[in-house]
Amino acid sequence: MTASPASPSASSTPGGHASSTGDGVVHRISVLLYSNDVATRDAVRVAVGRRPARDVEVRSWRECATAPAVIEAVESGAFDLLVLDGEAAPVGGLGLCRQLKNEIFECPPVLVLTGRPQDGWLAAWSQADLAVPQPLDPISLAGAVADLGRTVGSSAAVGARVH
């Protein structure tokens, strides 16, 4: 999915971002989405949409259904944000998040989808940057993606918060 510039006066900058004169910065992000459940992947893509916020635009999605595919894709360094399903099987997104954070140099920010609101401590253990509990709330999910999308290219650490 290729995105068009935010405005006719937008100019691309290195790192996949586009800055527009007068409007501030539009963060264009590529997202890797991991879940073994196609319905969960569809729900996430629909909830986030193409523009989760005025200043954040999803330029591409890559869906993965297996942990080895995620690891291979993340090692390529082509993604700005990872969304991992904590309820995926046989490898859950929480354990996969911890593995990626410990093994991948400069791992992109990670948003984990937890099974319930009380699983925030698991998200903290996994070293996730943000967590959104199920059932998925489209506003919370889009907000979390936008928050992490704004950190792309900066050293701002968000910390493991439940959104």
Segments from the language model and where they lie:
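Acidic, metal-coordinating helix/loop segments flanking the phosphotransfer/catalytic sites
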Residues: 63-81
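Conserved phosphotransfer microenvironments
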Residues: 80-101
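Conserved acidic segment of CheY-like receiver
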Residues: 27-49, 82
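CheY-like receiver
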Residues: 152-163
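Alpha4 helix (beta4-alpha4-beta5 surface) of REC/receiver domains from two-component response regulators
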Residues: 115-131
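His-Asp phosphorelay/catalytic-motif detector in bacterial-type signaling
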Residues: 104-109
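Conserved phosphoryl-transfer motifs of two-component systems
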Residues: 81, 129-132, 138
